[in-house]
Amino acid sequence: MEQGAEDIPVVYLHDIKRQYTQGEATLTILNGAKLALWAGQSVALVAPSGSGKSTLLHIAGLLEHPDEGEVYVSGAATTALTDAERTQIRRTDIGFVYQSHRLLPEFTALENVMMPQMIRGLKRSETVSRAKEILAYLGLADRITHRPSELSGGEQQRVAIARAVANAPRVLFADEPTGNLDPHTADHVFKALTQLVKATQVAMLIATHNMELAGRMDRRVSIEDGVIVELE
């Protein structure tokens, strides 16, 4: 990417192609997709089921390799990196939030949020302080000793958000994070996400079917015939 440092997006997808084989047929999901994600900007990915939303997020988040094309993270190409190198980038630069919270049931909210930092080898005192700070920011200061089964759906998802940003990532990917929530709770969780984007200047790409929530994002994009298109 021949740009000045100030012009480099946090994540840039360049000519991404991804195909799957079903029996004797080849299904092209992404076909030359391009997308730039900038610091402090929220982007909604709105597209029908089966259009490639999750595939795009997995490729952008280095969970899956494209068949062709390149994924740049802070200007550095990643597709030729080893699995260990890609894992390290995911741990330091990338956060994920899913439709299902995926919290560890045997651990408290605090311990779940501490986990990504502990994996990186940070001191326990540092991880406790950071986890408490994030949970308090998300309105969960009085719930830190509760296990997932003792939390409401909205609280569980806010803990998942806290865990995703525990390592201060550069980019946050969210795949239908409010899909299992009622409208009121979904609104609360969505506000928490967008507030974090502005407060931390993280880039965010969120796949959602909720057009009302998507309308509050800085940008809206879709997938048509395997390519990314900007929406009004």
Swiss-Prot record:
Record's GO cellular component terms: plasma membrane
Top-rank lineage group of the source organism: Bacteria
Principal location: membrane
Span of domain ABC transporter: 11-231
Topology in membrane: Peripheral membrane protein
Pfam families referenced in this protein's UniProt entry, alphabetically: ABC_tran
Cited SUPFAM superfamilies: P-loop containing nucleoside triphosphate hydrolases
Ligand binding (ATP): A47, P48, S49, G50, S51, G52, K53, S54
Keyword annotations from UniProtKB, A to Z: ATP-binding, Cell inner membrane, Cell membrane, Membrane, Nucleotide-binding, Translocase, Transport
Record Gene3D superfamilies: P-loop containing nucleotide triphosphate hydrolases (3.40.50.300)
Annotated GO biological process: lipoprotein localization to outer membrane; protein localization to outer membrane
InterPro entries named in the record: AAA+_ATPase, ABC_transporter-like_ATP-bd, ABC_transporter-like_CS, ABC_transpr_LolD-like, MacB-like_ATP-bd, P-loop_NTPase
Subunit-structure text: The complex is composed of two ATP-binding proteins (LolD) and two transmembrane proteins (LolC and LolE).
Protein name per UniProt: Lipoprotein-releasing system ATP-binding protein LolD
